């Protein structure tokens, strides 16, 4: 959506329109390019209208983070559910969904994992809880099937997320080529499973 598309705004959906425009701006200009006033201009509403939905810029960033975590959780859960019972296939599908999201929405993923909570904003968004729970469940299933090593499932969950985030960072930064994605994901599954 851009300046010319502001006519798509209808009473009652301004929050969704602002978030969509904020995601586009984030993709193109990074978090420093986001401001409530600029979002108002881009969506064709009064400069005060975004404040009805976001008290300040941090509230907008928090909402983007929550939206991103919810979407990533949905995509990873769907990828897991669409595969058969083979654990390695399920792990590979979840890993691929994470990296796909990161490649498409790298700036959003950076924002999601860079967000810090303070006393003024909510703790972990519900989507983040779902995402981390889904990865934790996947780890526990692998341990129960004796495909993943025994030990602290929380440690393995964090290690898996860190590995996937690292692969995504390498690809989005150009330090690894996109053509290497499949091999990197296959190697990840191979390294984690036994």
PLM-predicted stretches and their roles:
Residues 1-13, 24:
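N-terminal intrinsically disordered/low-complexity leader segments
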Residues 1-3, 133, 137-144, 173-194:
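C-terminal peripheral helix-coil segments that are non-catalytic and often amphipathic
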Residues 14-17, 21, 25-59, 63:
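Helix-turn-helix
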Residues 35, 109-113, 121, 151, ...:
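Short, hydrophobic secondary-structure boundary micro-motifs
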Residues 63, 77-108, 156-160:
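Hydrophobic alpha-helical connector segments
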Residues 66-73:
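Short, basic, alpha-helical segments at the C-terminal edge of helix-turn-helix-like DNA-binding modules
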Residues 101, 110, 120-147, 154-158, ...:
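Amphipathic alpha-helical packing segments from all-alpha helical-bundle domains
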Residues 101-120, 169-173:
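Amphipathic alpha-helical segments used for helix-helix packing
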């Amino acid at each position: 959506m851009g300046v010319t598309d502001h006519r798509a705004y209808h009473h009652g959906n301004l929050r969704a329109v602002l978030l969509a425009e904020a995601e586009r701006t984030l993709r193109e200009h990074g978090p420093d390019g986001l401001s409530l006033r600029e979002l108002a201009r881009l969506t064709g509403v009064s400069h005060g209208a975004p404040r009805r939905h976001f008290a300040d810029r941090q509230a907008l960033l928090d909402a983007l983070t929550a939206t991103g975590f919810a979407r990533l959780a949905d995509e990873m859960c769907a990828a897991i559910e669409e595969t058969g019972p083979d654990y390695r296939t399920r792990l590979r599908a979840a890993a691929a969904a994470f990296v796909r999201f990161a490649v498409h929405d790298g700036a959003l993923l950076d924002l999601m994992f860079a967000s810090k909570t303070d006393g003024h904003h909510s703790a972990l968004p519900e989507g983040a809880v779902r995402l981390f729970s889904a990865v934790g469940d996947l780890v526990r299933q692998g341990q129960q099937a004796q495909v993943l090593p025994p030990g602290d499932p929380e440690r393995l969950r964090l290690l898996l997320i860190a590995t996937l985030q690292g692969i995504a960072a390498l690809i989005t930064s150009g330090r690894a080529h996109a053509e290497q994605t499949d091999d990197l994901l296959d190697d990840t599954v191979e390294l984690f499973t036994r």
